């Protein structure tokens, strides 16, 4: 099995593309969902965030106040690095747990929905393939203005706060162009899924895993045969 990192930009259509992959039966892990899960009350990351930033980052119900925490690390590289040092290991741990579940279920590849895949670069080394859901800037701007009921200035400000889609597209292995009709985008997704399914890149890991299991089974057999006492089949000195 191998990992496919998928990203996009605001109003590029990434969520719709993810839905098509899921309809095709693909395994999808949303890293944003994991990031929210690992900071829930009672989780190690939640406790460490409170220790590092104080109780002012908590809501009345004990949840992390994401806006307050965001304000605390805004333009504060040291604080941002501290927060990342708390959350990123937990995110990777949960990500690997979810990935292993899909591995055991026989999936050939798993899609990781990672909004900041190229910005943070932390997870890139785990990805066999990277996919960007792209659309041209004019289309992105028009969609965002309509979807969020924004004026042009506010919509442009939101787009400009992200790494440009054209830059992400240059860094990706695969680009799904969502600038035109949705039917064309959907066909691109179907073709990419077929290509990834045909890939043999999942075999080395699966063969290695099966080889490891065979080795463990052989070791257990030898230990059972040579180290445990043999059962008594009868008493040679007894009379019939």
From Swiss-Prot:
Write down the InterPro entries for this protein, in alphabetical order.
Depp_CoAkinase, P-loop_NTPase
BP GO annotations: coenzyme A biosynthetic process
Q: Could you tell me the keywords of this UniProt record?
A: ATP-binding, Nucleotide-binding
Where, in this chain's numbering, is ATP bound?
A: 8-15
Q: Which residues form the signal peptide?
A: none
Pfam families from the entry? Answer: CoaE (PF01121)
- According to the UniProt entry, the coiled-coil residues are none
Segments forming domain DPCK: 3-207
Q: Does the keyword ATP-binding apply?
A: yes
Q: Entry's Gene3D superfamilies?
A: P-loop containing nucleotide triphosphate hydrolases
Report a single Gene Ontology molecular function: dephospho-CoA kinase activity
| Top-level taxon | Eukaryota
The entry's family comment says:
Belongs to the CoaE family.
Q: What is this protein called?
A: Dephospho-CoA kinase domain-containing protein
């Amino acid at each position: 099995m191998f990992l496919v990192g998928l990203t996009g930009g605001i109003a590029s259509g990434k969520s719709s593309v993810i839905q098509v992959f899921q309809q095709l039966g693909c395994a999808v892990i949303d890293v944003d969902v994991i990031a929210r899960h690992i900071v829930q009350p009672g989780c190690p990351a939640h406790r460490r965030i409170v220790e590092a930033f104080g109780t002012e980052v908590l809501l009345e119900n004990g949840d992390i106040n994401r806006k307050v925490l965001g304000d605390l690390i805004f333009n504060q590289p040291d604080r941002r690095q501290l927060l990342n040092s708390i959350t990123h290991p937990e995110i990777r741990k949960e990500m690997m747990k979810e990935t292993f579940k899909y591995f055991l279920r026989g999936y050939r590849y798993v899609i990781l929905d990672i909004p900041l895949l190229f910005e943070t670069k932390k997870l890139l080394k785990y990805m066999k393939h990277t996919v960007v859901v792209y659309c041209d800037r004019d289309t992105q701007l028009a969609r965002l203005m309509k979807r969020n009921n924004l004026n042009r200035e506010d919509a442009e400000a939101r787009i400009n706060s992200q790494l440009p889609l054209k830059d992400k597209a240059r860094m990706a292995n695969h680009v799904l162009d969502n600038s035109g009709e949705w039917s064309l985008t959907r066909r691109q997704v179907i073709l990419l899924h077929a290509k990834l399914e045909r890939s043999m890149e999942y075999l080395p890991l699966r063969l290695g895993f099966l080889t490891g299991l065979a080795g463990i089974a052989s070791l257990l057999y030898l230990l059972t045969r040579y180290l445990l006492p043999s059962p008594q089949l009868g008493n040679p000195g007894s009379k019939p």
